[in-house]
Amino acid sequence: MRIIQTTGKRKTAIARAVIREGRGRVRINGKPVEIIEPEIARFTILEPLILAGEEIWNSVDIDVKVQGGGFMGQAEAARIAIARALVEWTGDMNLKEKFIKYDRTMLVGDPRRTEPHKPNRSTKGPRAKRQKSYR
């Protein structure tokens, strides 16, 4: 039995996907993907599977474990891990090209991170300044 493990990162969320032969089940942290809420996060996770097609989707089972970050960061990390797993599973360069043409961050990741807050400005943000008064 063939098993492939891949990872995906987005902001502070890290996802680990395990793909194996199966019947098309997708589980996120042990829950079926069908019950993941909100809906936008669910569709984000399923994007690579929809693009790959039903034939590939129904021939594999995917288990994803995600931790860290918020719900959207986790969804996008899971999406990256699933896309990488599908490309590795099929070994199909056409699928890889399809993913890259649709959305490059599906395989490559997004390097942007939040800017650290600077000293003496408390919770206002990294670039907030006190308003200057001339009188």
Curated annotation (Swiss-Prot):
SUPFAM superfamilies: Ribosomal protein S5 domain 2-like. The keyword Ribonucleoprotein applies. GO terms for molecular function: RNA binding; structural constituent of ribosome. Residues 108-118 have a biased composition (Basic and acidic residues). One of its GO terms (biological process) is translation. Residues 108-135 are annotated as: Disordered. InterPro entries: Ribosomal_Su5_D2-typ_SF, Ribosomal_uS9, Ribosomal_uS9_archaeal, Ribosomal_uS9_CS, Ribsml_uS5_D2-typ_fold_subgr. Keywords: Ribonucleoprotein, Ribosomal protein. Residues 119-135 have a biased composition (Basic residues). The keyword Metal-binding does not apply. GO terms for cellular component: cytosolic small ribosomal subunit. Belongs to the universal ribosomal protein uS9 family. This is Small ribosomal subunit protein uS9. It comes from Pyrococcus horikoshii (strain ATCC 700860 / DSM 12428 / JCM 9974 / NBRC 100139 / OT-3). The gene is rps9.
